[in-house]
């Protein structure tokens, strides 16, 4: 019975497919549905899995939806941080050990939303070296701030046990951030070629590039800020 329930969950749970040199394809349900007014030569109704194409080249005139512009501008979905063997050139994960908590940070997958800096500047000190002070606030405050990180670049450990995901389970959701990436929460599965989550990354939440300029595609690396990407969604 449990296996059947698991199968149903996998079918009903949304997924995001990254199409090579093309858009993201958000599939809300993996169960094929009959297409109205369409049949095969035997008169049998045809079924398909339906989804929504989301722009990731940054040039669609109908953001966040894809309008085919990626093929006109020659968009490339190549991840420039991988070598010929699809292995990361380098990982930038660092550990900042405090008295009660250790904060882990991977710069490679940071979307530069600056939630941590704005929320807890006594711990996350942009421009300082080291830029993280794990003793700069109460442990509970640090946990709350780390769990707000949209990209999954931040995580924490207490007594040698690492925590990468929020304490409460969240419903699957894709949020279009203003002038920024797609923020994914709730453990939506990401499928496609050459997908490499960074060291220590969360599978529950991550940020996907939609400006087209990230070097770490499909993940956001903050390039939308450098190129002044604009979308008021």
Role assignments for model-derived ranges:
Residues 55-56, 60-63, 73-80:
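Hydrophobic, ordered structural segments
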Residues 20, 42-56, 91-112, 124-144, ...:
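Ferredoxin-like iron-sulfur electron-transfer modules
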Residues 53-57, 64-69, 118-123, 134, ...:
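A structural feature that tracks compact, well-ordered secondary-structure segments
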Residues 4-29, 166-168, 173-176, 186-187:
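Short helix-coil boundary/hinge micro-motifs
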Residues 31-37, 122-133, 189-193:
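Short recognition patches in nucleic-acid-associated and regulatory proteins
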Residues 70-88, 125-138, 162-170, 224-233:
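Short cysteine/histidine-rich metal-coordination sites, predominantly Zn2+-binding motifs
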Residues 63-73, 111-129, 146-160, 217-228:
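Iron-sulfur cluster-binding cysteine motifs and their immediate structural context
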Residues 99-113, 172-195:
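Surface-exposed interaction/gating patches
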């Amino acid at each position: 019975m449990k296996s059947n329930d698991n199968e149903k969950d996998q079918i009903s749970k949304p997924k995001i497919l990254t199409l090579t040199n093309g858009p993201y394809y958000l599939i809300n349900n993996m169960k094929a549905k009959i297409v109205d007014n369409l049949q095969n030569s035997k008169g049998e109704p045809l079924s398909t899995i339906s989804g929504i194409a989301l722009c990731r080249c940054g040039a669609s005139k109908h953001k966040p939806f894809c309008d085919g512009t990626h093929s006109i501008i020659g968009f490339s979905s190549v991840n420039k941080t991988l070598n010929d063997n699809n292995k990361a050139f380098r990982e930038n994960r660092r550990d900042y050990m405090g008295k009660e908590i250790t904060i882990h940070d991977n710069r490679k997958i940071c979307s530069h939303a600056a939630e941590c800096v704005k929320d807890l500047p006594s711990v996350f000190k942009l421009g300082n070296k080291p830029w993280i002070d794990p003793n700069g606030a109460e442990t509970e405050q640090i946990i709350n701030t780390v769990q707000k990180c949209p990209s999954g670049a931040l995580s924490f450990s207490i007594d040698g046990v690492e925590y990468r995901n929020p304490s409460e389970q969240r419903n699957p959701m894709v949020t279009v951030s203003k002038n920024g990436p797609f923020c994914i929460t709730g453990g939506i599965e990401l499928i496609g070629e050459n997908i490499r989550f960074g060291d220590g990354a969360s599978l529950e939440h991550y940020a996907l590039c939609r400006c087209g300029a990230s070097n770490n595609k499909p993940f956001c690396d903050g390039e939308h800020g450098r190129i002044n990407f604009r979308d008021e969604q």
